[in-house]
Swiss-Prot record:
Binds 1 zinc ion per subunit. A motif (D/ECD-tripeptide) lies at residues 279-281. Ca(2+) 1 binds at D96, C202, N205. Belongs to the venom metalloproteinase (M12B) family. P-III subfamily. P-IIIa sub-subfamily. GO terms for molecular function: metal ion binding; metalloendopeptidase activity; toxin activity. GO terms for cellular component: extracellular region; plasma membrane. Residues 215-301 form the Disintegrin domain. Gene3D superfamilies: Collagenase (Catalytic Domain), Disintegrin domain. Pfam families: ADAM_CR, Disintegrin, Reprolysin. InterPro entries: ADAM_Cys-rich, Disintegrin_CS, Disintegrin_dom, Disintegrin_dom_sf, MetalloPept_cat_dom_sf, Peptidase_M12B, Reprolysin_adamalysin. Coiled coil: none annotated. It comes from Gloydius brevicauda (Korean slamosa snake). This is Zinc metalloproteinase-disintegrin-like brevilysin H2b.
Length: 424
């Protein structure tokens, strides 16, 4: 658990500057870009104390017209920006969070707004920020604050439930001239709770050099174009393989970090760098030519798994018993075959396929690929055929594709029980 919490995280940030920002900078886009690069450099500096690096991987400037309605109603603007990000921006450029920078003044004292504990979510990993000051640092700290909300942090307050050790830290409810670049004990706890509870996956991946769109800064711990390594400032760098002042490898070094970098040299070819997680995963080994561990690979579909009783599909070993356990708890088991005869009826929730409003019953050979039936605990004389159904998601409670339905056979995505060799 502690290792998971201590792992370095990378927020790959997309920033959108709206039309009002272009007007504010008199149409000088180069000047506007520089202003934003400075903001991101400060945000990265602020977050390094939490072992988070923030990299600008995309910058979009709406120089002709706004692509959403940016208004003084912060709540509405945030909602439409989140919606636009999910339906438009994400399809064009991969990133973890998107923030809008605007010169429109929000109602009341609001200078920014963001969804809380939403990092990595499609329509809510967003924030909006008002470019409210001539001082770059104050705008950067506003965006750092809103990004903090995305990462699960609430405001620093002192009340009966919460005693925060700082009144002027990044997550202070209001911005002041005394504002600091530090995070309070409350923010650190909130962030750790967010990691534990939500397990956001997207921020575990390091951006590649070519993903970062801001000019390289030696000493910011991000590996950028033109750098061989970046271990932070000369004062804080503790990596003997990297010259902190130049961001070049020290003499005789082949690498400075990576799963296949051992004491500044590439690990020997064949050295395991990522163990197989389970039957459907493959262990990866170093090539001897690179500091990076090869891409995580999976066993081929149809590879036997689960004591040779099941078959792999997309890196998972779908086992019917486990599907019952996930719905009904540890005492659940797959129901007897007789329960699956309900799927032959093709009525109510019992079928193999449903297209629009039409229900297709299962053929006899496919009955174990339709609705899943389970029993709870030991069975007596009477068996109740337990099943699960959801109005919102018709796939919930159905046997998962890839599940074994007979010897040498699996359910395909059409819910037919087919030979494992033809399924894949």
């Amino acid at each position: 658990q502690q290792r998971y919490l201590n792992a370095k995280r990378y927020v790959k940030l997309a920033i959108v500057a709206d039309r009002s920002m272009v007007t504010k900078h008199n149409g000088k886009l180069k000047k506007l870009r520089k202003w934003i690069y400075r903001i991101v450099n400060t945000i990265n500096e602020v977050y390094r104390s939490l072992n988070i690096l923030v990299a600008l991987v995309y910058l979009e400037i709406w120089s002709k017209e706004d692509l959403i309605n940016v208004t003084s109603a912060a709540k509405d603007t945030l909602a439409s920006f989140g919606n636009w990000r999910a339906t438009d921006l994400l399809k064009r450029r991969s990133h973890d969070a998107a923030h809008l920078l605007t010169n429109i003044k929000f109602d009341g004292t609001t200078v920014g707004k963001a969804y809380v504990a939403s990092m990595c979510q499609q329509d809510s990993s967003v924030g909006i920020n008002q470019d409210h000051s001539k001082i770059n640092l104050l705008v950067a700290l506003t965006m750092a604050h809103e990004l903090g909300h995305n990462l699960g942090m609430s405001h620093d307050v002192v009340n009966t439930e919460k005693q925060c050790n700082c009144g002027t830290c990044v997550m202070a409810p209001t911005i002041s001239d005394q504002i600091s670049k530090l995070f309070s004990n409350c923010s650190k706890n909130d962030y750790e709770n967010f990691l534990t509870l939500y397990k956001p996956q997207c921020i575990l991946n390091e951006p590649s050099k070519t993903d970062i769109v801001s000019p390289p800064v030696c000493g910011n711990e991000l590996l950028e174009v033109g750098e061989e390594c970046d271990c932070g400032s000369p004062e804080t760098c503790q990596n003997p393989c990297c010259d902190a002042a130049t961001c070049k490898l020290t003499s005789g070094s082949q690498c400075a970090k990576g799963l296949c970098c051992d004491q500044c040299k590439f690990s020997k070819s064949g050295t395991e760098c990522r163990a197989a997680k389970d039957d459907c995963d493959i262990a990866e080994s170093c090539t001897g030519q690179s500091a990076d561990c090869p891409t995580d690979d999976l066993q081929r579909n149809g590879q036997p798994c689960g004591n040779n009783a099941q078959y792999c599909r997309k890196g998972k070993c779908p086992i019917m018993t486990n599907q019952c356990i996930s719905f009904y708890g540890p005492n659940a088991a797959v129901a007897p075959d007789a329960c699956f005869d309900y799927n032959l009826k093709g009525e109510g929730n019992f079928y193999c396929r449903k297209e629009q409003a039409t229900i297709f019953p299962c053929a006899q050979k496919d009955k174990k690929c339709g609705r899943l039936f389970c029993v709870l605990g030991p069975t007596g004389k009477r068996i109740s055929c337990e099943h699960t159904y959801s109005q919102d998601d018709p796939d919930i409670g159905m046997v998962l594709p890839g599940t074994k339905c007979a010897d040498g056979k699996v359910c395909n995505s059409n819910r037919e029980c087919v030979d494992v060799n033809t399924a894949y």
